[in-house]
């Protein structure tokens, strides 16, 4: 039997020591055994985000949003993940929800930055051939 708590502990240790890729290996195994455990999935998403495995982070965060659409922290992480992929228009709804849920001025500032990037992207001239 797999000890999910031990895998989670090791994953957190690796992440805390600056090795998010190493953490992701333990946390992915924990997630295989506990695919709806929000703590495991959040730690896995953070490990993927910190190691720039943004597609993987997005998939895990989407699962977390499906599990609890009202989790402001998950919405914030998903918005940041999408923004980091220059998908600011996709990030904006998640960041707005995070701001509404958390009422955190820093999150509201992220909304403003994402909105500005969306506006800038829409106004940018098309690339020359």
Feature map (PLM): residue ranges:
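Structural signature of tandem alpha-helical TPR/SEL1-like repeats
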Residues: 17-29, 51-63, 86-96, 121-126
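Canonical tetratricopeptide repeat
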Residues: 9, 43, 77, 110-111
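TPR-adjacent "capping" and linker segments in tetratricopeptide-repeat scaffold/adaptor proteins
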Residues: 1-6, 126-128
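Short coil turns that delineate tetratricopeptide repeat
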Residues: 35, 69, 102-103
């Amino acid at each position: 039997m797999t000890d999910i708590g031990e895998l989670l502990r090791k994953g957190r240790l690796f992440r805390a020591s600056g090795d998010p890729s190493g953490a992701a290996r333990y946390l992915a195994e924990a997630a295989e055994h506990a695919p709806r455990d929000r703590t495991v999935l959040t730690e896995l998403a953070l490990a993927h985000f910190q190691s720039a495995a943004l597609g993987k982070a997005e998939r895990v965060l989407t699962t977390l949003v499906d599990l609890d659409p009202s989790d402001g922290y998950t919405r914030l992480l998903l918005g940041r993940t999408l923004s980091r992929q220059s998908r600011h228009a996709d990030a904006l709804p998640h960041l707005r929800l995070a701001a509404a849920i958390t009422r955190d001025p820093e999150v509201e500032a992220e909304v403003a930055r994402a909105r500005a990037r969306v506006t800038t992207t829409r106004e940018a001239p098309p690339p020359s051939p």
